[in-house]
Amino acid sequence: MKIVFFGTPEFAVPTLEKLLINPEFDVLAVITQPDKRRERGNKLTPSPVKNVAMSYSQWENIAHDLPVWQPERIKKDTETLNRLKELDVDAFVVVAYGQILPQKILNIPKLGSVNVHGSILPQYRGAAPIQWCLYNGETETGITTMLMDVGMDTGAMLLKATTPIGLLDNADDVAQKLSVIGGDLLIETLHKLQQKEIQPIPQDNAAATYASLIQKQDYGLDWSRSALQLHNQIRGFYPNCITTFRNQPLKITASFPLGAAYREELPPELQKMLQKLPDLSQISGSPGEVVSITKGVGAIAQTGEGLLLLREVQLPGKRPQSGWDFVNGTRLTVGEVLGNGS
């Protein structure tokens, strides 16, 4: 089967690799976003998908290079459109490409354009399904393959695969799991499409939810929210959630909402840390206030409902550090308040 692959971030890499190593598929070209400049050094950096495509001839001992195209705006790029039309292609595979494909491109392949989406559609259509799924405290997510149309993840569904979400899973953890699942599901989808063993199912638009692009203000931690809500925000928008500490920004990159109802889900090493904690049943404070510090564990902050253990934080210009190292390095004391410009 002849394929053109559209994709950009690390999430798309496992699917591309599975296509490249499978002799049943011939990847004719890879289309990815243009190289971007890094903040440090202003150096142009290729996408993860481009890196894989450019190294393909080396790790497969192939005599020819895999063509990589990087249109700035594919909707208006007539050269790319004409190139695609010239190919005798069976299917387009699209995984987190980053640009909307117009109908004139979607219509080119014989079997259609297949998208690998990181949610159980029709829930969490849009650009950030993994992040908002975690933010909302979902305990399960998955991958949906679909035939693309011009809408935002509105095409007819082909196959689905689900996976549980652990209480400590962050956006990177879930993305890594889903990227592998997505690659396997895509191969199965293409096989069934080719054999006409799959019936596309229209989405129920009334049941659809949306996962919009994350904005800078979404990263701010509001300590009046519950410990569980803050924990879900921290892991969903990992590693960017931010508060203030002594009038400077402080990222919180890992946390845990204290409460007996959650402890049976925890790995042994975290269980041991929690066993060191004193009785917290009579401890309280104002939202954001550090109400307890335990040696070898770290600081606990009051929230609008419940207590939040700060497992990992990051000060400006520093690397992430454990909650206990943060306490030691800053000489944090009980009674200090996070947030509100403190």
From Swiss-Prot:
The protein's gene is named fmt
Binding residues annotated for (6S)-5,6,7,8-tetrahydrofolate, in chain numbering: S119, I120, L121, P122
- Listed GO cellular component terms? cytosol
Judged by the first EC level, this protein's enzyme class is transferase
State a single Gene Ontology molecular function: methionyl-tRNA formyltransferase activity
Q: What is its EC number?
A: 2.1.2.9
On whether Electron transport is a keyword of this UniProt record, the answer is no
Superkingdom: Bacteria
Report which residue ranges the record marks as coiled coil: none
Question: Could you tell me which species this protein originates from?
Answer: Nostoc sp. (strain PCC 7120 / SAG 25.82 / UTEX 2576)
- What is this protein for, i.e. what is its function? Attaches a formyl group to the free amino group of methionyl-tRNA(fMet). The formyl group appears to play a dual role in the initiator identity of N-formylmethionyl-tRNA by promoting its recognition by IF2 and preventing the misappropriation of this tRNA by the elongation apparatus.
Please tell me whether the keyword Lyase is annotated for this protein.
no
- What reactions does this protein catalyze? L-methionyl-tRNA(fMet) + (6R)-10-formyltetrahydrofolate = N-formyl-L-methionyl-tRNA(fMet) + (6S)-5,6,7,8-tetrahydrofolate + H(+)
Q: Which InterPro entries match?
A: Fmt, Formyl_trans_C, Formyl_trans_C_sf, Formyl_transf_N, Formyl_transf_N_sf, Formyl_transferase-like_C_sf, GART_AS, Met-tRNA-FMT_C
Query: What PROSITE patterns does its record include?
Result: GART
* Pfam families for this protein: Formyl_trans_C, Formyl_trans_N
Write the protein's name: Methionyl-tRNA formyltransferase
Q: Report the sequence similarity comment from the record.
A: Belongs to the Fmt family.
Task: Extract the HAMAP family matched here.
Answer: Formyl_trans (MF_00182)
Query: Where is the organism placed in the taxonomic lineage, from the top?
Result: Bacteria, Bacillati, Cyanobacteriota, Cyanophyceae, Nostocales
